[in-house]
Amino acid sequence: MSTWLLPENIADVLPSEARKIEELRRRLLDRFRSYGYEMVMPPLLEYLESLLTSGGADLRLRTFKLVDQLSGRTLGLRADITPQVARIDAHLLNRQGVTRLCYAGHVMHTRPRGLHATREQIQIGAEIYGHAGLEADLEIQQLMLDALHLAGLSRIRLDLGHAGVLAALLARDAQAAERGESLYDALSGKDVPLLNELTDDLGADTRAALRALPNLYGDASVLAEARTRLPVLPEITRALDDLAQLASQPKGVEVAIDLADLRGYAYHSGAMFSAYIDGVPNAIARGGRYDHVGQAYGRARPATGFSLDLRELARISPVEARGTAILAPWAQDDALGAAVAALRDAGEVVIQALPGHDHVLDEFACDRSLVERNGAWVVEPR
């Protein structure tokens, strides 16, 4: 096997892609900071049980596992940063009020999530802990859309769902609850024949409600239909009210309601939202409420957040990240060295051309030159 080959769905990030990723990372983290979010940097490697406190079987399957040579315990390479941030909030910060945290780092997946997806994503996200009200969900939803607009994306479609609807239906019917995982699979895949089979012997109200969910998809008017077709339960009424408020917030964004979109159901406890753009089949960003995520660390707090993959965002973003620079000669000249240092201190990129290498530089567009005129070094257009 060639020594330069990489594993399947693993790739190097070359300069043109890397500078775009870094430009987007800086833009998004700066925007998070403008909202009051503090950055944290969890480790790439943790004890497996710490990484798998939430997310169900899917997260376990996506997590690389290895043995710690020091302790003999099983370690995991993180597949999702959110549980780590929950651990930091619950165990290390231990604050009483609202905490806003953000992050950006690599995650590893044992299997790609799509045909051409990478197994090494760069996950960036933001989370609010400590507020159970819808105000936190509204802020996170707005921040997610703000981040996508910063990346130059337009014609965004926001899909909204709510884990509380299915949870309420299963809580009132023990027989349905026993088939919860199968019902979740059928609803997520919009597999109506399987859904009909699974609900055939359930109570009439539960059967009718579960069979209605795949058809409750469309614009915000679907919520009115849902109120007539679903049982009048406090949890369902509250979920539909939340979705109505979330749907009314975005401006200039297409909003769709999908009460059968349950991806992440095992993880979420309330509103769920996904952002799509034209020409991209999968969601570019996902978020939602997950109030139970800190429970395994001894301190469950209300929590809501969103995340996205920076590599995928860079692939579809029209943002131009190629910077301008000043091309300077290389010479052992004190005046030249002082001029170069002064320009760099002022924030300019100055590239000194090494002797015998006059090729065009790809990383930066050298639109100016540092030249000597009348004994002084000055910058001129190229």
Swiss-Prot record:
Q: What else is known?
A: This function is generally fulfilled by the C-terminal part of HisG, which is missing in some bacteria such as this one.
Q: Which key words are in the record?
A: Amino-acid biosynthesis, Cytoplasm, Histidine biosynthesis
Recorded name of the encoding gene = hisZ
State whether keyword NADP applies.
Answer: no
Family in the record: Belongs to the class-II aminoacyl-tRNA synthetase family. HisZ subfamily.
- Classification via Gene3D superfamilies: Bira Bifunctional Protein, Domain 2
Q: Which PANTHER family match?
A: HISTIDINE--TRNA LIGASE, MITOCHONDRIAL-RELATED, HISTIDYL-TRNA SYNTHETASE
Q: Where's it found, cell-wise?
A: Cytoplasm
Molecular function per GO: histidine-tRNA ligase activity
Read off the InterPro entries from this record.
aa-tRNA-synth_II/BPL/LPL, HisRS-like_core, HisRS/HisZ, HisZ
Organism whose genome encodes this protein: Burkholderia cenocepacia (strain ATCC BAA-245 / DSM 16553 / LMG 16656 / NCTC 13227 / J2315 / CF5610)
**Where is this protein chiefly located?**
cytoplasm
Q: Which SUPFAM superfamilies match?
A: Class II aaRS and biotin synthetases (SSF55681)
Assembly description: Heteromultimer composed of HisG and HisZ subunits.
Which protein, by its recorded name, is this?
ATP phosphoribosyltransferase regulatory subunit
Q: In which pathway does it act?
A: Amino-acid biosynthesis; L-histidine biosynthesis; L-histidine from 5-phospho-alpha-D-ribose 1-diphosphate: step 1/9
Q: Which GO terms describe its biological process?
A: histidyl-tRNA aminoacylation; L-histidine biosynthetic process
**HAMAP family noted in UniProt:** HisZ
